[in-house]
A protein has these predicted regions:
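Bacterial N-terminal signal peptides that target proteins for export
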Residues: 1-13
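Active-site mouth of glycoside hydrolases
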Residues: 31-190, 195-205, 215, 316, ...
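Alpha-helical scaffold elements lining the catalytic groove of polysaccharide deacetylases
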Residues: 132, 254-255
Length: 337
């Protein structure tokens, strides 16, 4: 084969071509979770509540928006997947849904974005763990097989915000069950895992990750103080009051201390970190929202974490799809000029 190639291309070109042919595909490359986090840097949550999944013709988010995200200074998208609604009685994923997911993943990868596949049926799982468990196992068995040859820019996240019935002990047991399902087809793919109690920092010290699995990225979500970040949110009756501001020295020091606690855990466990969600709801004062968002992003960056803002569209928005423009104060807070 080498002589034939030399005759066509010359000796140096032939050797280069053979080397390229012999190189492992992108999917076979092993990237450490630390290096993965260094490439992820700034991210944003997308597509959790978009009509795309049920009827692509009604989608608000368009594939071109991945270029908007990349051009906007982001390197990662966290896809919020409510997959259970697209499973049959046998827990098989709908082929049409998988086709849509493939299109989304391919469009994001084409923009050189890291893609986190985040299984987002956290409410269902928290309310009824017994019903959730076989679905979640089936989901990761199918997704693991489906994406086993995907580039290393595709990252898995076992479950968003385990809560309620998914106590620390239950969730840790599920982690020990789910990871082997993933590893059967994706032995070195990086997987995001966070603690119970809605990925809250207060439960990070209860998170039990298998010491032998060194392809894990730990995650937490940060919305403290809730009376500020969720003020006026209809789904959270505990925070009905509006007009709450943020930005005092004491509030900033509280955030720093919270992040320092996470960093101490990360160093002790030798795990890289993803701040998988943060932000402040739209009913808050914009100046305070921008200040909070900027502070959280900079604190994460200062500690070498990747982050993903909540979210591109729907609420807490960073981008106005109707006007096809970034919400300037939020975008500037996330990606300073």
């Amino acid at each position: 084969m080498l002589k034939a190639l030399q005759a066509l291309t010359g000796p140096l070109a032939a050797c280069a071509l053979l080397s390229a042919l012999a190189a492992p595909p992108a999917a076979a490359r092993e990237i450490s979770p630390q290096d993965q986090v260094r490439t992820m840097t700034r991210g944003i949550n997308v597509l959790g509540y978009d009509p795309l999944w049920k009827d692509p013709a009604k989608a608000r988010f368009q594939m071109r928006h991945f270029k908007t995200i990349k051009d906007g200074g982001f390197n990662t998208v966290r896809l919020n997947l409510h997959a259970f609604a697209h499973m049959g009685a046998d827990n098989k994923l709908d082929p049409a849904w998988l086709k849509t997911l493939d299109q989304v993943v391919e469009a994001a990868l084409a923009q050189k974005l890291t893609v986190i596949l985040d299984e987002h049926d956290f409410n269902t799982c928290g309310e009824d763990p017994a019903a959730c468990r076989p679905r979640l196992v089936a989901f990761w068995k199918q997704i693991g097989e489906h994406y086993k040859d995907a580039p290393d820019g595709v990252v898995f996240e076992l479950l968003n915000e385990p809560n309620k019935g998914l106590t620390d002990a239950v969730w840790n047991a599920w982690i020990a069950e789910l990871l082997p399902v993933v590893r059967a087809t994706n032995p070195t793919r990086n997987v995001v895992v966070g603690p119970a109690f809605w990925n809250n920092i207060s439960h990070l010290d209860q998170l039990k990750l298998p010491q032998g699995d060194r392809h894990l990225i730990a995650t937490v979500h940060y919305y403290l103080p809730m009376e500020f970040t969720h003020q006026g949110a209809s789904w959270n009756p505990a925070t009905p009051k509006t007009g709450v501001t943020w930005g005092t020295d004491a509030e900033r020091q509280r955030m720093k201390a919270d992040f320092d606690g996470v960093q101490a855990w990360a160093r002790a466990q030798d795990r890289p970190m993803l701040l998988g969600e943060f932000g402040a709801y739209d009913k808050g004062d914009m100046a305070s929202r921008a200040a909070y968002t900027a502070a959280a992003a900079r604190e994460a960056e200062a500690r070498g974490w990747a982050w993903a803002y909540w979210q591109f569209d729907s609420d807490f928005i960073a981008y106005d799809i109707g006007k096809e423009t970034w919400v300037t104060p939020i975008h500037d807070a996330l990606v300073p000029k």
